[in-house]
Structure formats: structure tokens, C-alpha cells
């Protein structure tokens, strides 16, 4: 998967196209990610110990990883990702500027 938890991304297709946010969770086996403030859904929650009132809760739902594109740290624009070996480690870099994404 070309994105990781904590990456700043932009949604490139679907109803939330153009929105930007941080990846809160990634599910590589399902090829899905949860992006902050994107794909908001309403869930009906039964009353429980943690939520004695119950009711309708809004939260982010996963979207397919192909719908998001990482943002270039230098320009702030969406970019494709490449991989290269630096000091014996495989790191991701932004193809738009050449900036390394992994610390």
C-alpha cells in the first residue's frame, strides 16, 4: 500500500473529491483507509455502558486506497509515490518533488 497511518492525503474521486485529511487507520488486507473528515456516515448505537444514551453517532468509514493520493510535503499538491533505497532502507519519495516521505 502506498500510504500509511499519519500521511496527509487528498481524495481524488467520489463524493468527497478534493477533501484533504490525515489517515487515521490503514487496512492493507482490505486495501482501505480511514481519512479524517472524509466519508462520514451515521450509525445507530444501542445504549451501553460507554454510551448510556445511545442514539445516532457520526463517524468516518473506510474508503478504497485508490481514491486517495498523498500530498507532496514541499508543494502541498497530490503526488505519485516512488520507492528507492537510502542507507540500506527502502523509503517512499514524492515523484513530483523528489522529497522523501519516510523519516
Curated annotation (Swiss-Prot):
Transmembrane segments: none annotated. PROSITE patterns: RIBOSOMAL_L24. One of two assembly initiator proteins, it binds directly to the 5'-end of the 23S rRNA, where it nucleates assembly of the 50S subunit. GO terms for molecular function: rRNA binding; structural constituent of ribosome. One of its GO terms (cellular component) is ribosome. GO terms for biological process: translation. InterPro entries: KOW, Rib_uL2_dom2, Ribosomal_uL24, Ribosomal_uL24_CS, Ribosomal_uL24_KOW, Translation_prot_SH3-like_sf. Coiled coil: none annotated. It comes from Geobacillus sp. (strain WCH70). This is Large ribosomal subunit protein uL24. The keyword rRNA-binding applies. Part of the 50S ribosomal subunit.
Amino acid at each position: 500500500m502506498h500510504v500509511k497511518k499519519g500521511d496527509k492525503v487528498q481524495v481524488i474521486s467520489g463524493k468527497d473529491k478534493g477533501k484533504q485529511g490525515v489517515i487515521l487507520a490503514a487496512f492493507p488486507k482490505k486495501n482501505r483507509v480511514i481519512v479524517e473528515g472524509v466519508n462520514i456516515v451515521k450509525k445507530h448505537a444501542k445504549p451501553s455502558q460507554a454510551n448510556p444514551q445511545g442514539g445516532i453517532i457520526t463517524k468516518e468509514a473506510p474508503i478504497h486506497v485508490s481514491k486517495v493520493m498523498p500530498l507532496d510535503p514541499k508543494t502541498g499538491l497530490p503526488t505519485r509515490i516512488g520507492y528507492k533505497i537510502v542507507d540500506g532502507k527502502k523509503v517512499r519519495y514524492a515523484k513530483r518533488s523528489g522529497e522523501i516521505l519516510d523519516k
